[in-house]
């Protein structure tokens, strides 16, 4: 890698700020999940917590996108970080005063859901303005690689930290990390780009919708992804009680379990360039079939170590599907339409997550956790098998391509 980018003070500030933000955000998510489950013992309440994050996040992502370029991206990011830091003082102070209630966590989730959609697109947009064009790929590699490393380390570290110092001091650590992230971002020297006449938000969004539904490969891959996202929504509700109640583990075990998927994704992303295949459809949808089987496995096994191994396998399989999926989209969509179409794709796929959260919260209370893992695993595997078996879906193979290398990775289980 070109090390000259590390001599750029603005980039180093962005790099460090993003890494600390990822760590603080992951710790905060851990704390919120544990507090809600300890206060209520209800998987439905845990699901409500995630809904209160995702619903505002999805809605605000729609309306905020066209306006990001009009504002200072640097100050959007700083505002996002400091707002997140301050809102975590609500449960922290309530805990110290002995008056912590579930609604305090719900307020935190709503606010975080509103400000998080601001940070990510602003971060992606500001990077080309603070590094030279020839250093952009190196800068993105540093940013993306560090973020994925934090996603791997944070669950393990979060489990250990909460287990040893408690949720109250961990919330204080979250506040410090997010506030520090904002201060680091102050060191960036933003170069504002003059804006020409822009279309209205509605006009831009309509363009994205029309193009998205015109490309059937993108549409159907989005539908397959939506089934996976539905499963992710379900697991957001049941992963914590699965480890602590079903497998009788502690918060350290939960952290290791949650780290398994991003670790697998990193492994999968390293392997993907070395794997040759004849049919893109068979490779991608076959990966989803195996991914569905990992859910079924979680519904059967009794050992935490096996559950962690299964999550690593799931991460590898999801990398195979997701990286090819995003690369197909990047190659099919014209550059001037990329943001609009990608936002439509993201909103449609992410909408499946709240549905999964509601489903998981209700069904887990009625039927239990193990049957739910088996159910979502069967759904993902069966839908993927249909895509493999039915000749209609041959268009997913597309034109012959010697290689399909990723431009961007998404390391979440989605």
Please provide the spans of the model-predicted regions.
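Juxtamembrane intracellular "pre-TM" segments in multi-pass secondary transporters
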Residues: 1-11, 190-223, 407-414
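Helix-loop boundary and gating motifs at the non-cytosolic
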Residues: 2-56, 210-259
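Substrate-agnostic recognition of the 12-TM MFS/MFS-like secondary transporter fold
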Residues: 12-29, 53-68, 72-87, 104-162, ...
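MFS-fold secondary transporters
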Residues: 28, 37, 90-95, 112, ...
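Transmembrane alpha-helix termini and helix-breaking/packing motifs in multi-pass membrane transporters
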Residues: 33-39, 91-97, 153-173, 245-246, ...
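Helix-breaking motifs and short loop linkers at transmembrane-helix boundaries and internal kinks
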Residues: 40, 72, 94-95, 99, ...
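C-terminal transmembrane bundle of multi-pass solute transporters/carriers
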Residues: 59, 76, 80, 90, ...
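Helix-loop junctions on the cytosolic side of multi-pass membrane transporters
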Residues: 125, 129, 171, 175-199, ...
């Amino acid at each position: 890698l070109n090390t000259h980018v590390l001599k750029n003070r603005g980039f180093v500030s962005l790099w460090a700020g993003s890494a600390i933000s990822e760590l603080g955000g992951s710790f905060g998510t851990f704390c919120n999940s544990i507090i809600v489950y300890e206060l209520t013992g209800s998987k439905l309440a845990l699901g409500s917590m995630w809904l209160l994050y995702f619903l505002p996040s999805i809605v605000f992502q729609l309306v905020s996108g066209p306006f990001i370029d009009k504002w200072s991206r640097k100050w959007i990011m700083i505002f996002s970080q400091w707002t997140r830091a301050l809102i975590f003082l609500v449960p922290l102070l309530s805990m110290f005063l002995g008056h912590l209630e579930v609604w305090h966590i719900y307020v935190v989730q709503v606010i975080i859901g509103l400000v998080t959609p601001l940070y990510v697109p602003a971060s992606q947009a500001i990077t080309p303005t603070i590094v030279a064009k020839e250093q952009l790929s190196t800068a993105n590699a540093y940013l993306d690689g560090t973020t994925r490393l934090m996603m791997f380390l944070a669950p393990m570290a979060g489990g250990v930290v909460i287990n040893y110092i408690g949720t109250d001091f961990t919330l204080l650590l979250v506040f410090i990390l997010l506030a520090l992230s904002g201060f680091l971002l102050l060191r960036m020297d933003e170069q504002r780009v003059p804006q020409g006449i822009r279309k209205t938000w509605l006009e831009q969004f309509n363009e994205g919708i029309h193009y998205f539904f015109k490309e059937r490969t993108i549409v159907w891959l989005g539908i397959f992804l939506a089934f996976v996202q539905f499963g992710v929504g379900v697991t957001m509700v049941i992963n914590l009680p699965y480890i602590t109640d079903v497998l009788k583990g502690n918060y350290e075990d939960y952290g290791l379990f949650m780290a398994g998927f991003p670790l697998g994704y990193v492994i999968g992303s390293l392997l993907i360039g070395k794997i040759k295949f004849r049919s893109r459809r068979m490779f991608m949808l076959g990966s989803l079939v195996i991914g569905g089987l990992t859910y079924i496995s979680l519904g059967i096994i009794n050992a935490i170590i096996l559950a962690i191994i299964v999550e690593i396998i799931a991460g590898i399989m999801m990398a195979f599907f997701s990286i090819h999926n995003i690369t197909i989209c990047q190659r099919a969509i014209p550059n001037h339409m990329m943001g609009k179409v990608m936002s439509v794709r993201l909103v449609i796929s992410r909408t499946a997550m709240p549905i999964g959260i509601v489903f998981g919260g209700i069904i887990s209370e009625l039927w239990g956790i193990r049957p739910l893992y088996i159910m979502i695993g069967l759904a993902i595997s069966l839908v993927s098998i249909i895509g493999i078996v039915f000749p209609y879906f041959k268009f997913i193979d597309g034109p012959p391509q010697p290689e399909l290398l990723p431009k961007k990775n998404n390391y979440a289980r989605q």
